[in-house]
Amino acid sequence: MAAQVTPELANLNSKPEGGAPPKQVPVKDVPENEDVESDDDNEGDQGAGEPGSTGAAKKKKKKKPKKKKKGGPKVQTEPPRVILSSIFPNNDYPVGELVEYKDDNAYRTTNEEKRYLDRMNNDFLSEYRYAAEVHRQVRQYAQKTIKPGQTLTEIAEGIEDSVRALTGHDGLTEGDNLLGGIAFPTGVNLNHCAAHYSPNAGNKMVLQYEDVMKVDFGVHINGRIVDSAFTVAFDPVYDNLLAAVKDATNTGIREAGIDVRMSDIGAAIQETMESYEVEIKGTTYPVKPIRNLNGHTIGQFEIHGGKNGKSVPIVKGGDQSKMEEGEVYAIETFGSTGRGYVRDDMETSHYAKVPDAPNVPLRLSSAKNLLNVITKNFGTLPFCRRYLDRLGQDKYLLGLNNLVANGIVDAYPPLCDIKGSYTAQFEHTILLRPNIKEVISRGYDY
């Protein structure tokens, strides 16, 4: 649930796949460590009593049995359904993109104390890399298969079913989703809608060829959240819009680092994005950063970093605070052909329990019961109405609205620019490790 809005705006079943069995495809970047016995030493073996032999029959050379391959299967299916721990049985998940610190922080790459501190974070890194590899495999399949004519519900649930399968947490038993799985509702945001749109039950909206769709989803293992997003467009007329935002996000990632000021990152992002323009139906539009959407810190089980969370602007000015060692950030940028400013619009689907929610006596029994379900299944992780439906909850809207009214649950309505405009988004999660920056969600796709 990547988008974090500026304060002024903030105040305003897993289903089995039918048809043929899943296709198996190789998993990229998986090291092959198996030792397979060569068959070369069987060459030239001769059977006993061959024609023309004059002596005793030659003894047949004993074949050595081939060693069994170690570990689990080395392939993923299409759609992704193989739990990742069976593909990486030793929890040796792929490393993200490693970027050495520069300038005054260049010493961190070789400093022994920093390297020692980094080695202490093995569990932290393993959980993050697990979540990141799930994200990569799920999104890369989604990018290949998302097509015009699909409903937004089909797209969102396809992604969610894959995340649940690869993490091994279907979220149907109490507390299971807190161990791992979906970190927040899958955003499938069309055109002028930039963020926080996920279909509610009964939604029949269909993806069209001329649409620009932002796909934003999160994966977590033990509350270590990987937040990453990409944009899908079928008409090449939007290529420059997507290129502008992807370039701006990569600029933000490049500039981010320990002791870097947030305002400096925002200025660099804005300069990059505004260097692009896009022509649509004969009209040329400058690509504008959406100035009231930001990147953000990520905390354990808290997508926006909790009480002491920080924002990463995508325009110049503003926050003078600095990034610090050990922090986790979602670096995301949004570009628009509209005003470059979003407002709440359309029906709400995203909700999250407030981490330090007030202890308010609830009069509605439906609100009390729903709060218990939310706490035990999502904690402070965001959820949507479809997830409550999936848990068998019904007639819960009155109770949900009561929790929102009492400040116990926050509602996150869709965030939209002016109608007729087009918006794009790209996002990655980065770890500011003591000795190196790791773009944990980086893949060959973006």
UniProtKB/Swiss-Prot annotation:
One of its GO terms (cellular component) is cytoplasm. Disulfide bonds: none annotated. Its EC number is 3.4.11.18. Substrate binds at residues 196, 304. InterPro entries: Creatinase/aminopeptidase-like, Met_Aminopeptidase_Type2, Pept_M24, Pept_M24_MAP, Pept_M24A_MAP2, Pept_M24A_MAP2_BS, WH-like_DNA-bd_sf, WH_DNA-bd_sf. CDD domains: MetAP2 (cd01088). Residues 1-88 are annotated as: Disordered. Its main location: cytoplasm. A divalent metal cation 1 binds at residues 216, 227, 427. GO terms for biological process: proteolysis. Keywords: Aminopeptidase, Cytoplasm, Hydrolase, Metal-binding, Protease. It is found in: Cytoplasm. Residues 32-44 have a biased composition (Acidic residues). GO terms for molecular function: initiator methionyl aminopeptidase activity; metal ion binding; metalloaminopeptidase activity. It catalyses: Release of N-terminal amino acids, preferentially methionine, from peptides and arylamides. SUPFAM superfamilies: Creatinase/aminopeptidase (SSF55920), Winged helix' DNA-binding domain (SSF46785). Its cofactor is Co(2+); Zn(2+); Mn(2+); Fe(2+). A divalent metal cation 2 binds at residues 227, 296, 332, 427. Binds 2 divalent metal cations per subunit. Has a high-affinity and a low affinity metal-binding site. The true nature of the physiological cofactor is under debate. The enzyme is active with cobalt, zinc, manganese or divalent iron ions. Most likely, methionine aminopeptidases function as mononuclear Fe(2+)-metalloproteases under physiological conditions, and the catalytically relevant metal-binding site has been assigned to the histidine-containing high-affinity site. Cotranslationally removes the N-terminal methionine from nascent proteins. The N-terminal methionine is often cleaved when the second residue in the primary sequence is small and uncharged (Met-Ala-, Cys, Gly, Pro, Ser, Thr, or Val). NCBIfam families: met_pdase_II. Belongs to the peptidase M24A family. Methionine aminopeptidase eukaryotic type 2 subfamily. This is Methionine aminopeptidase 2-1.
